[in-house]
C-alpha cells in the first residue's frame, strides 16, 4: 500500500495500477463489437482514486472511447463515481463497495447525467465492478436514445502494473 494513500482508501488500494484486457459491447441500435481496454487507477493522497479509461478497436487499434474522473469514498462501504466522456456526457454514479478476502465488488447507478447540446441522449447508466486478485471485470448497463436500462458493455482486465 502506498505510504501517502489516504486512509479512507485502504480497502480499495488493490485497485491501484494499470489494467488491460478485452471486452465486448452490444446495444439494440448498433452492431455488436469487441474492444481492447486500458484502465488506470491512481491517487494523489486525497480520499479519492483518479480513474482513466480508454478503448481501441480489436481489428485495427483505432480509438473508440475514453472516460476520466474520480472514484470517491465518502464513507466506508460507499462510493461515488464522477466521470466525463469526450462524447459530451458527464455522469455521477453512487453506490456501495465491499472488500473482503482479496475480492472487491462495487455496484453503482447514476444519480445525474449531464449532456452537451450535441451529445446523444443517455438517460441511465449503472456499473458493476469485481476485482479478484489480478483480474478486474465489469459490466455496464445503459439506457439511451429512448431505450430502457440494459446491458451494453462487459470486459475482463488483467493487472499490468
Curated annotation (Swiss-Prot):
It comes from the Bacteria. It catalyses: peroxynitrite = nitrate. Binds 1 heme b group per subunit, that coordinates a highly solvent-exposed Fe(III) atom. Its EC number is 5.99.-.-. A motif (GXWXGXG) lies at residues 17-23. SUPFAM superfamilies: Lipocalins. One of its GO terms (molecular function) is peroxynitrite isomerase activity. Its cofactor is heme b. The keyword Heme applies. Heme b binds at residue 152. Keywords: Heme, Iron, Isomerase, Metal-binding. InterPro entries: Calycin, Nb(III)_bact/plant, Nitrobindin, PeroxynitIsom, THAP4-like_heme-bd. Disulfide bonds: none annotated. It is an enzyme of class 5 (isomerase). Pathway: Nitrogen metabolism. NCBIfam families: PeroxynitIsom (NF045819). Heme-binding protein able to scavenge peroxynitrite and to protect free L-tyrosine against peroxynitrite-mediated nitration, by acting as a peroxynitrite isomerase that converts peroxynitrite to nitrate. Therefore, this protein likely plays a role in peroxynitrite sensing and in the detoxification of reactive nitrogen and oxygen species (RNS and ROS, respectively). Is able to bind nitric oxide (NO) in vitro, but may act as a sensor of peroxynitrite levels in vivo. Forms a 10-stranded antiparallel beta-barrel structure able to accommodate a hydrophobic ligand in its interior. In fact, this fold hosts the heme group, which is located in a wide surface cleft. PANTHER family: PEROXYNITRITE ISOMERASE THAP4, THAP4 PROTEIN. Belongs to the nitrobindin family. Homodimer. This is Peroxynitrite isomerase 2. It comes from Mycobacterium marinum (strain ATCC BAA-535 / M).
